């Protein structure tokens, strides 16, 4: 049984999602957004770091997964996004959590089945997969998607390592 914290980084809005893995089941624990208010980038990065640190304190995750960013609107946006990712990763590292990174295509494929999925499709599938009463807001849904992607990757690695058994993880041959 593991708790996974997924993060969708952003310099203004950083989404987070927390799921618990019990065998082949994923249980929703919480999600939301860290909305930064400071005009100064350094202030926003501190808010992201502090927010992720508080979420880690509250949920006590075992693993941390974050979206890998490879493209942005312009160079300045890419730098700010990279710094936001760094603030979140440092918070996880300070808490001694293993960090996994996934591309947007990997996340969309794990959640929807296609790497070209739209935000609405991700929101809908997250709602279905985690049996939520309503679709989560876009940034939180993306973060939950990161956590779900990590769960699926983790399950695949367990199966490939030969540690899976029919009783705990289904049939892998």
UniProtKB/Swiss-Prot annotation:
Its main location: cytoplasm. The RuvA-RuvB-RuvC complex processes Holliday junction (HJ) DNA during genetic recombination and DNA repair. Endonuclease that resolves HJ intermediates. Cleaves cruciform DNA by making single-stranded nicks across the HJ at symmetrical positions within the homologous arms, yielding a 5'-phosphate and a 3'-hydroxyl group; requires a central core of homology in the junction. The consensus cleavage sequence is 5'-(A/T)TT(C/G)-3'. Cleavage occurs on the 3'-side of the TT dinucleotide at the point of strand exchange. Belongs to the RuvC family. The keyword Magnesium applies. Binds 2 Mg(2+) ion per subunit. This is Crossover junction endodeoxyribonuclease RuvC. It is an enzyme of class 3 (hydrolase). InterPro entries: RNaseH-like_sf, RNaseH_sf, X-over_junc_endoDNase_Mg_BS, X-over_junc_endoDNase_RuvC. Its cofactor is Mg(2+). It catalyses: Endonucleolytic cleavage at a junction such as a reciprocal single-stranded crossover between two homologous DNA duplexes (Holliday junction). GO terms for cellular component: cytoplasm; Holliday junction resolvase complex. One of its GO terms (molecular function) is DNA binding. Its EC number is 3.1.21.10. The gene is ruvC. It comes from the Bacteria. Mg(2+) 1 binds at residues 8, 139. The active site is at 8, 67, 139. It is found in: Cytoplasm. Mg(2+) 2 binds at residue 67.
């Amino acid at each position: 049984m593991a708790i996974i914290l997924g993060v969708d980084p952003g310099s203004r809005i950083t989404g987070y999602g927390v799921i618990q893995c019990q065998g082949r089941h994923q249980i929703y624990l919480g999600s939301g957004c860290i909305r930064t208010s400071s005009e100064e980038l350094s202030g926003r990065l501190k808010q992201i770091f502090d927010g992720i640190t508080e979420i880690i304190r509250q949920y006590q995750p075992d693993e941390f997964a974050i979206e890998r960013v490879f493209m942005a609107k312009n160079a300045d946006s890419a730098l700010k996004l990279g710094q936001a990712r760094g603030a979140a990763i440092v918070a996880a590292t300070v808490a001694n959590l293993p960090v996994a990174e996934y591309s947007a295509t990997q996340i969309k494929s794990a959640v929807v089945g296609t790497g070209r999925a739209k935000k609405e499709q991700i929101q809908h599938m997250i709602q279905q997969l985690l049996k939520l009463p309503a679709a989560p807001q876009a940034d939180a849904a993306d973060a939950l998607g990161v956590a779900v992607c990590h769960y699926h990757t983790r399950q695949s690695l367990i199966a490939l390592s030969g540690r899976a058994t029919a009783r705990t993880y289904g049939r892998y041959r």
